[in-house]
Amino acid sequence: MKKYSGYIYIAIGAIFIFAAAFLVRHNFNESAEAGEASDDLLVGVVEQMPGRVVEYDESGDMPVVDVDGRSFIGTVEIPSLGLLLPIQSEWAPENAKVSVCRYKGSVYDNNLIVAGHNYVEHFGNLKNLHTADEVIVTDMNGKSFYFEVTDIETLGSYDIEEMEAGEWDLTLFTCTIGGANRVTVRCESTGKTSETGEVPDVIEAAEKSKHIRKK
């Protein structure tokens, strides 16, 4: 009897190992697909930026462009993580499967919140950021706005009020594995921006980026 019980435990253990391996593989494939989709969209976004930074209306809405039937307000670059990603204009679960999204706000009003899934190729490594790391948001006029990380916190997944609270110039967030909490990165503006008439900083960044180079 003990012999058969041992076989049962071994079988159950094997099932758990197989299920875990399947889940890891599934998540890896899903992350890779999300990365490829984002890369394709990034190319279309950067191609629609002007060759020189143009004037913008700080009191108006961020300009939006269409790429493959989706709307984008620009890009977000996190050099320390090797990320350069297109930002969709509106958050939706389906939108977040292919790129990060504006949750609310505007870079012009210093209250932009950007959300993304925890895919490795999206915002999965936000937890690895450090204070003073650089974050760059570029609008569709080619103008880049520079920020630095000032705080990293973990909030409950339903703590919407806390997510939107405070006078932060830029917030990035993603869910933890399992979705119970949100890794939340708060940033402040450094005051640095690209100048009108300059070649957009993001064009050079795109040329060097793995997200463009591998295409």
Residue ranges and their predicted role:
Residues 6-215:
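Solvent-exposed, non-transmembrane regions of membrane-associated and secreted proteins
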